[in-house]
Amino acid sequence: MAEEIITETNRETATDHAYGGAQIQVLEGLEAVRKRPGMYIGSTGPSGLHHLVYEIVDNAIDEALAGYCTHIEVTIKPGNIIEVSDNGRGIPVDIQPKLGIPAVTVVYTVLHAGGKFGGEDSGYKVAGGLHGVGASVVNALSEWLTVRVRRDGAEYEQSFKRGKPDGDLKKIGAAASTGTTVTFKPDPEMFQETTLYRYETLLKRLREEAFLNAGVKITLTDERPDADRPQDEQSGEMRTETMCYEGGIRSFVSYLCERRDLTPLHPQVMYMKGEGQGAVAEVALQYYDNSYNELLLSFANNVHTPEGGTHEEGFKLALTRVLNEYGRAKGILKDKDENLSGPDAREGIIAVVSVKLQEAQFEGQTKAKLGNTFIKGLVNNVVYKALTEFFEENPAVAKAILEKATQAARARAAAKKARELVRRRSALESNRMPGKLADCHEKDPSKTELFIVEGDSAGGSAKMGRDSNIQAILPLWGKMLNVEKARADRIYGNDKLMPVVTALGTGIGDEFDISKVRYHKIFIMADADVDGSHICTLMLTFFFRYMRPLIDHGYVYVAQPPLFKLQKGQTVKYAYNDDEMKLLSAEMPGAKVNRYKGLGEMNPDQLWETTMNPDNRVIVQIKIEDAERADEAFSILMGEQVEPRRQFIEKNAKYANLDV
């Protein structure tokens, strides 16, 4: 049977497709990349800068998919120069028939030129991207780029400057091996925000590639001096890491579990694989006893699809169907019970879905969502058949998963009742807003701000100091709920979170509606100490787990109250950290320094001037650049196990600014 739970690694075999100059097709010329780089790499900020590396690595990965590459080496050199080397076949150097120039020159100078467009004459069966799109775009956005090819017993070299050839292709010597080495320097004219590469960002992506391509070895090395590194990655030492996972995506799921504070519900990671219509689908999953969340990562031709697509749809459909059918057949779900919903079936799951196919159809330039319709049926069939068989052969595991899902269903029903009770109560009350909410006069959400303030004392000062036209104040009281350890039904009974839910007006979880939000700026305002930071983290965990679109839309902020007040005569200045305090003390010798222990120590005028006045305040907008890392961080920080949290804090403490 093609779809089964297996323990041995299935390895792709090398294709016998020809790969020479005749296979390099030309679709259109390379134009406008430097004029509109965002169309090709998403942005010219840090994400676009790192995307250059991914494009070159993807070419090497495609060689691995075809069965010709086993080792990829990525090196960050001094000056933030990138070198990517592989032991694949080497880019063709013979003359491309249509243009009459070497194929490697075509690949690096012509947009949509490459050997990955499918068909019998293609150089590849499947590919993560269009061969020449990545190569030529990286070339266009580099100050300079050099490609060295080892092929047919010789080594060749071609150099480029800002996308244009800097001389002809040259044969520079003999070569005992095959492969391609690309070295490039991002153009600072294009990447004006930064040209500093982050080792950790590259490491995460390359580790994903290693998991998704079982047995392929990937090495990342950072040879830069600290002066060429981001400040928080300066260590004075060269860093290197080699990754190779024979277990493939099963190892990926295990790794994701190990990085979190989770206890597996069953010992074995389930793995299933199947083929159809020239595509291959792989799924690995495991449930966790102490998790109420789901983490589903999907990939198409090694490209992460954060917005999902047809492969995710097929997986979710099959998983829910199998659990319901098995539950009914075994009497775990009674006749009176409703079917499990999708979220019920996926509570506490970590799953990786990976498909590899010809002619992948991605929605959008950044390939965030897979659109091939037949993939839904393929993944659905693979998961349905394999999981049904697994449950029959492992009834104890199946029962444990069903019991967890039914508990989730009961909690969902309880949350629904609690939600309806809150609604009925609100409908009977003349004022539906929380009693302690001091609302603003303005009704246009795009102009209004909500300050969620810890404690009645600070809340009182904030109410007196605010601009009541646009600023609303909601003091929090009672015990804060850690939602990482609780299901949604407990939120509706929490006297600290429910006022927030009611004031915002959006609902939570599946019922969340961003169009109903009453404020477009939501500030968490807590004391600048350990307790305040804990409260802030609890609130951010709640927003991330149950009101995530607020963060995605850029509506959530953390207010930054000052730590110090310096006064000399009539001159008053505020410092927001120790370094600022030292600088101001040097500027104001003899100044009286007061250290604030809490927001309540400030009078209304001071709180307005330092923390709430749009003209003066220091704020931090909460952004999620990497949802997986955010999920991991919340799981570690707010979970039950102490050791992972201690390790996380020790690793990141030097970047924190806490009054301890």
Identify what each model region corresponds to.
Residues 1-22, 30, 52-54, 62-64, ...:
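GHKL-family ATPase ATP-binding module
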Residues 35-54, 125:
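Conserved short strand/loop->alpha-helix "switch" segment adjacent to the catalytic nucleotide/phosphoryl-transfer site
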Residues 40-48, 92-98, 303-310, 375, ...:
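Flexible beta-alpha connector loops of hexameric P-loop NTPases
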Residues 62-63, 90-91, 530-531:
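Residues immediately C-terminal
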Residues 91-114:
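Short conserved segment of the HATPase_c
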Residues 410-429, 444-449, 460, 464-466, ...:
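C-terminal interaction appendages of subunits in large macromolecular complexes
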